[in-house]
Design a protein with these regions (language model features):
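Auxiliary Fe-S-binding modules of radical SAM enzymes
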Residues: 1-11, 179-183, 193-196, 200-337
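Canonical Radical SAM [4Fe-4S] cluster-binding loop centered on the CxxxCxxC motif
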Residues: 4-44, 286
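Conserved, mostly hydrophobic/aromatic
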Residues: 16, 20, 24, 64, ...
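Glycine-centered loop/turn positions within well-structured domains
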Residues: 22, 124-125, 268, 294
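Residues that scaffold the ATP/ADP-binding catalytic core of kinase and kinase-like folds
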Residues: 23, 27, 72, 125, ...
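A short acidic, helix-capping loop that chelates divalent metal ions and anchors anionic groups
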Residues: 32-37, 123-131, 196-201, 295-297
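Radical SAM/AdoMet-radical enzyme domain recognition
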Residues: 41-63, 71-191
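Conserved G/P- and acidic residue-centered "switch" motifs that form tight phosphate/ATP-binding loops
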Residues: 68
Length: 337
């Protein structure tokens, strides 16, 4: 499936819920959000039907996101169903990690192949401040996230740790987060803050600045091609796993894993964009920066046949925007260099 610019669209990100067990400051407003009613979100069966249609159109990688995807009941069932589709090569999940460790084996057996775990600090008090978790709730603390990382590795899942650097919240933590890749075959990725939603209220730190700081601490970095550290460690990797999307990776002396940078603001990567997003409300979004999209829930619930849905998806994808304009927003003061 190609868009109007000839970009091959083979990656589908699915938000399975709007709910989350944390209240991260750059993601959720202080007053919280009003959760969607049950009937407003797609059922797991509806999600699977859409994935099946899009697999026939060329989708090869699926990522489950939220909210926090693991608060959605019966999610392993969806993973298992998607895993059974012949064209799907990778099923990944992005999670805050607090609920993952006890379920790691369940998800691996269902067909999960990779997990991205969000972690912005190793300091317990700062973690509570960023995430809004209760001081008494040890199950949702930073230790639970570290257990998730190790549990995922034990299950031979490919692990990426995502960190969003912000001057106001975790500017002092970058070296500690990066050190997680010193003795673990993981990718630690620093993602430039995008000036949308609550993120507009914070100041991100550029990838250039983070790399400079890490080199002062750990030594000169060498740029490396996008190859999974598990493959480097000896595990055979599917060729599709070698495509790491927009991240640029570096190897530091003595590190088992890699350090990556995703720089949507300072280094726009729209020309290589290969993804579309399905919201939990059933809208197919073609770009994060634009609200317009295709309302698939209405089609599903009005009795549309698969062929009609396929044609509507193809028509929408052909209109995928050429690029975002987050950089213009960031020019108002949202990124330090």
């Amino acid at each position: 499936m190609q868009d109007g610019l000839g970009r091959e669209i083979d990656y589908l990100r699915i938000s399975v819920t709007d709910k989350c067990n944390l209240r991260c400051r750059y993601c959720m407003p202080p007053q919280g959000i009003t959760p969607l009613a049950h009937e407003e979100i797609l059922t797991l069966e509806e999600i699977f039907r859409l994935v099946g249609i899009m697999e026939q159109l060329g989708i090869r990688k699926v990522r489950l996101t939220g909210g926090e995807p693991m608060v959605r009941k019966n999610l392993p069932w969806l993973v298992e169903q998607i895993h059974g589709l012949p064209g799907i090569r990778e099923i990944a999940m992005t999670t805050n990690g607090t609920l993952f460790a006890p379920q790691a084996e369940v998800y691996r057996k269902a067909g999960l192949t990779a997990v991205n775990i969000s972690l912005d600090t190793l300091d317990p008090e700062r973690f509570r401040c960023i995430t809004g978790c209760d001081r008494a709730d040890r199950a949702a603390g930073v230790d639970s996230v570290l257990r998730a990382i190790d549990a995922a590795l034990e299950q031979q899942l490919r692990v990426k740790i995502n960190c969003v650097p912000c001057v106001e919240m975790n500017g002092e933590d970058m070296e500690g987060i990066a050190a997680l890749a010193a003795d673990r075959p993981v990718d630690v990725r620093f993602i430039e803050l995008m000036p949308i939603g609550c993120g507009k209220d914070y100041t991100g730190i550029s990838s250039k600045e983070i790399l400079s700081r890490l080199e002062r601490r750990f030594g000169a970095a060498i740029a490396v091609p996008g190859k999974s550290p598990l493959a480097v460690a000896g595990r055979a990797a599917d060729p599709y796993e070698e495509t790491d999307g927009p991240a640029e990776y570096y190897q530091f002396p003595g590190f088992s894993g890699r350090i990556g940078f995703i720089s949507p603001i300072s280094h726009k990567f729209c020309r290589e964009c290969n993804r579309v997003r399905l919201t939990c409300e059933g809208r197919l979004k073609l770009c994060l920066h634009y609200d317009r999209g295709l309302e698939l829930k209405t089609l599903l619930r009005s009795g549309a046949l698969d062929e009609e849905i396929r044609e509507r998806i193809l028509a929408a994808v052909r209109e995928k925007p050429s690029e975002h304009h987050f950089r213009e927003k960031a020019a108002d003061g949202g990124l330090t260099d």
